[in-house]
A protein has these predicted regions:
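Active-site groove signature of glycoside hydrolases
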Residues: 97-117, 138-147
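Charged helix-capping and loop-helix junction motifs
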Residues: 19-23, 51-54, 83-91, 120-128, ...
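N-terminal pre-domain/capping segments
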Residues: 1-99, 136, 168, 172, ...
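Acidic/histidine-rich catalytic cores of soluble enzymes
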Residues: 30, 36-37, 67-69, 126-222
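A short helix->loop->beta-strand "cap" motif at the edges of active sites that frequently abuts
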Residues: 64, 102-103, 140, 227-231
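Short acidic/histidine-rich active-site segments
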Residues: 232-239
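Conserved residues at the C-terminal ends of beta-strands
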Residues: 40, 108, 202, 236
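A structural motif
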Residues: 33-34, 97, 102, 196, ...
Length: 264
């Protein structure tokens, strides 16, 4: 298994102006000493070719793999032109992932009022199918992330249905260890492992002695071990504490479990 960072872990630090992508690449290499990063769209200053090549060159020089690029999107729009715009957005971000050398593009199914999910579902499926055809030409996997907060994919049930309905080898999962709302989140994670091309390691609350207080990491690592997961496991700290202090603490905690479960 490969340990990396999701740039969202430093989102508040980015917003304050104290962090940018170039600086964070150096932090990953020199302080966190990790080999991978997935980049949230808002943390890229632009999609201009010269800038993207600059980021790719710096990442390569620092021996950092850009494991995924993660735009925000939401399919299932009422207006045809709005849905086409979402598809075009994902096509453009597929190009960005290709330029950066990222094998995965994290996408969402989207959000809509729960009472409209069934009605809008075919639009979501068709749009992802269209995006997958384009991604296949670029050799980029669309890694769908189940997300809470009223999305189409609150649980593994809807997530598996989407994978079945889209039915593309270029569509897999960006499996987040903290997003499923199933009654048994750990059973859902275990069932999802065969479809995971990339993962987010969610950290919400760390104790002063470095324990995650909301998630059972022994159960999570047992699932990872049994699945023989070898992809990137990128830490996404979403706690309320200072990111500059608690992201490194998150890596210390996860490294203890990597050692305990012999997941090097």
């Amino acid at each position: 298994m490969k340990l990396g960072l999701c740039t969202w872990a430093y989102n508040r630090t980015f917003a304050s102006g104290k962090m940018d992508l170039e600086k964070l690449l150096h932090v990953c290499a020199e302080e966190l000493k990790i080999g991978g990063m997935d980049i949230i769209d808002v943390h890229l200053k632009s999609q201009d070719l010269d800038y993207l090549l600059k980021i790719k060159k710096l990442a390569t020089d620092l021996q950092i793999t850009i494991s995924a690029v993660s735009p925000g999107n939401s399919f299932g729009k009422d207006k045809r032109e709005d849905e086409k715009a979402e598809v075009e957005k994902i096509r453009q971000w597929t190009d960005t992932a290709y330029i950066l050398g990222a094998p995965n593009l994290r996408i969402f199914a989207g959000w809509a009022p729960k009472e409209r999910h069934k009605e809008l579902w075919p639009k979501v499926v068709n749009s992802i199918k269209e995006c997958a055809k384009y991604a296949a030409k670029k050799g980029v996997i669309l890694a769908i992330e189940s997300h809470n907060g009223g999305g189409y994919l609150p649980t593994s049930v809807e997530t598996f249905k989407l994978l079945k309905d889209v039915n593309s080898p270029w569509v897999k999962l960006n499996l987040d260890t903290g997003n499923y709302q199933d009654a048994d989140m750990y059973a859902a994670l275990k069932a999802s492992m065969p479809y995971a091309t990339h993962m987010h390691c969610k950290i919400h609350e760390l104790s002063e002695d470095g324990r995650e207080l909301q998630f059972d990491f022994n159960r999570i690592f047992t699932i990872l071990k049994e699945a023989n997961y070898r992809g990137f496991f990128n830490i996404e700290y979403e706690g309320k504490e200072d990111e500059l202090a608690f992201v490194p603490k998150s890596f210390e905690m996860v490294r203890r479990f990597i050692k305990k479960y012999d997941m090097f």
